[in-house]
Amino acid sequence: MNLSKTGLPFLWISAVAFFTDLITKLAVVKNFSLYESVNILPFFNLTYVRNHGAAFSFLADHAGWQKYFFILLALAVSFMILFFLYKNQATQKLQNTGYALMIGGALANAADRAYHGFVVDFFDFYWQQWHYPVFNVADIAICIGAGLLAIDAFKQNDKKESKQN
């Protein structure tokens, strides 16, 4: 099989997401004290926090087993998505880009968790006293990837409906 005709060439996007995330986290850890916050806009701070759980600090208050669980989960999901990329055609650009972003984000957070025992988060959006959960570049990559997959699914559904009519 010619691998250039699969979704695997899109893995460069995973590498960009992975390294962008790790570089930004390194900059935060080197230049901020824990919980230090710098106001950027009236609704946005850079705030260094440590997330021992998953999205929205899910399971953060447990005894430490969740670190290994989330690392294994990220690896398993990444390998599954890698298989999807292998099976996809290179022409499935939206889906392949979404998958690649999700792999890069998942592996970046897993690497952070394996190295530190937690994930470094720093994007802090808020309105008055309400704060959205703090997140990082890897989280953005995962969410954009999931959004691209949703858009692709709707587009595929529209194509099927138009063929039936």
UniProtKB/Swiss-Prot annotation:
Pfam families: Peptidase_A8. Pathway: Protein modification; lipoprotein biosynthesis (signal peptide cleavage). One of its GO terms (molecular function) is aspartic-type endopeptidase activity. The lineage of its organism: Bacteria, Pseudomonadati, Pseudomonadota, Gammaproteobacteria, Pasteurellales. GO terms for cellular component: plasma membrane. This protein specifically catalyzes the removal of signal peptides from prolipoproteins. It is an enzyme of class 3 (hydrolase). The active site is at 121, 139. The chain crosses the membrane at residues 9-29, 65-85, 97-119, 134-154. GO terms for biological process: proteolysis. It catalyses: Release of signal peptides from bacterial membrane prolipoproteins. Hydrolyzes -Xaa-Yaa-Zaa-|-(S,diacylglyceryl)Cys-, in which Xaa is hydrophobic (preferably Leu), and Yaa (Ala or Ser) and Zaa (Gly or Ala) have small, neutral side chains. It is found in: Cell inner membrane. It is a multi-pass membrane protein. Its EC number is 3.4.23.36. Keywords: Aspartyl protease, Cell inner membrane, Cell membrane, Hydrolase, Membrane, Protease, Transmembrane, Transmembrane helix. This is Lipoprotein signal peptidase. Its main location: membrane. Belongs to the peptidase A8 family. The gene is lspA.
